[in-house]
Curated annotation (Swiss-Prot):
Residues 600-636 are annotated as: Disordered. Belongs to the heat shock protein 70 family. One of its GO terms (molecular function) is ATP binding. It comes from the Bacteria. This is Chaperone protein DnaK. Residues 615-629 have a biased composition (Acidic residues). Keywords: ATP-binding, Chaperone, Nucleotide-binding, Phosphoprotein, Stress response. Acts as a chaperone. PROSITE patterns: HSP70_1 (PS00297), HSP70_2 (PS00329), HSP70_3 (PS01036). It comes from Maricaulis maris (strain MCS10) (Caulobacter maris).
Amino acid sequence: MSKVIGIDLGTTNSCVAVMESGQPKVIENSEGVRTTPSVVAFTEDGERLIGQPAKRQAVTNPDYTFFAIKRLIGRMMDDPTVKKDIDMVPYKIVPSDSNDAWVQGRDKKYSPSEISAFTLQKMKETAESYLGEKVEKAVITVPAYFDDAQRQATKDAGKIAGLEVLRIINEPTAAALAYGLDKGENKTIAVFDLGGGTFDVSVLEIGDGVFEVKATNGDTFLGGEDFDMRIVQYLADEFKKENGIDLKSDKLALQRLKEEAEKAKKELSSATSYEVNLPFITADASGPKHLNIKLSRAKLEALVEDLVKRTLEPCKKALKDAGLSPSDIDDIVLVGGMTRMPKVQEAVKGFFGKDPHKGVNPDEVVAMGAAIQAGVLQGDVKDVLLLDVTPLSLGIETLGGVFTRLIDRNTTIPTKKSQTFSTADDNQTAVTIRVSQGEREMAADNKLLGQFDLVGIPPSPRGLPQIEVTFDIDANGIVNVSAKDKATGKEQQIRIQASGGLSDDDIEQMVKDAEANADADKKKKELVEAHNGAEAMIHQTEKQLEEFGDKVPGEDKDAIDAALTELKEVKDGEDLEAIQQKTQALVQAAMKLGEAMYAAQQTEAAEADAKSDAEGDEDVVDAEFSEVDDDKKKDA
């Protein structure tokens, strides 16, 4: 049975882990790094780059380098958070046919699920390379505060990447699993998870292998990206004051600012000041302009103070829902790269009244927890029971647009709940069930997850028909809803899919595209390797010809020259087979050069030995000696 892997699909970075000898192990990628940037790029020549190679070329290819795509997953174009992002990223966010937020690639529009799938493919390949076997199943993490549409879109991404997603698990819960795997004592912990694009806080009770989430809260549009943007805004404003040029309207400059902002933010976690130095950032009629601004830690903290404060309100709500006070928390586990910021650690300590626990790697702990959950599902990890919750209340729209809750937030999942409703008008033969998720009292203020019709209700006075609505949330936090007319037994049900979202046909097509691209990528890689091999062989042969060409018989030299010419003719082409054949032909022809080289070396070695022997004879000194017998030696 193939291994089930755990993947932390992050906003900024992603990470993959697997269980080995009862412990989670984070796997290094092909670059030898344990985390991979969640960045995907499409180059001018049609190549698709993922991870560090994509991030490295972002400055020269800002329109088609996609980062922080997780902030768009499962969202509509009219979502206020999407509108905010449109102004802040250099790539184009465009509407799909169903008004979902997608991105514009070079050749077509891509859904955030597709872009995320490319990162998941990289994680899958990383695991396969390490394990030496095919990987087909995974546990993938999402922010605890992700709604149904976002969870479904993440599951779709896994499917497009060729993975069967056995479970979607909340990031703070995964972190708690990794933190508490070997801890026997009973504890109440808070997981404070501030990542690249999202913030979550979860309160859990752990002990004897049981991990029970008591409450969760968060903000799916608060993370490191927002901190970076504050620095970008500040640098752009300072530059404009001095030079009268708005760098934000220049995509290239904006990308350079973003990279430098991220670097400054990281440096200022340990240093007290950082010199932002960007030569030739732009130019005007007077010539090139350079940006040179000193940023202190104090200034950075002032710029992001309100963002740090925004993390505390969800903490209050989570504790209130759990019926606890800050002093009831035994340990605070910090997750996400942003928790390295001293100001964030200060805020956590101030709120909970104690120093946070720093025994876990904030960048890797979520993937490790996902691997543990994968081990549980595979049967490799025993005596671990995970009880998670739904982050938001679920209900339907009733008369007057009121949001009627069927399942309250922080209800343990999986769960099932039914409630009976009736008609609003006389002789009503159909009802529309509008399913929403959120905490507001009016349905219109909450997130509409989907709607469906129950038809064929016998005409009756209003209030008489009995329609039973059932909500069923699975362990992934994904919702199924059914409505049944008790009189006729007629039933209608749907697996909730956002009014946009990807249909099964869309996903199937994307899976096919991904598979086709995987083949194309493989061929492209083989072609690049063949080009490189041909270049290396040509260079090596020409160098050897210069040194030893005169020692090779004429006909052999002609054969080598002919093979060289033939390889040069095809080496830059697209015919992989021809390049490989001609390279091999040159390898065979060049063997004569190798023979000549060895013959020359042997001749030189023999001459050197002969010379050494001759010189040795010249240095011989004649000496007289007399033999002393043993008896004389004893007398001496």
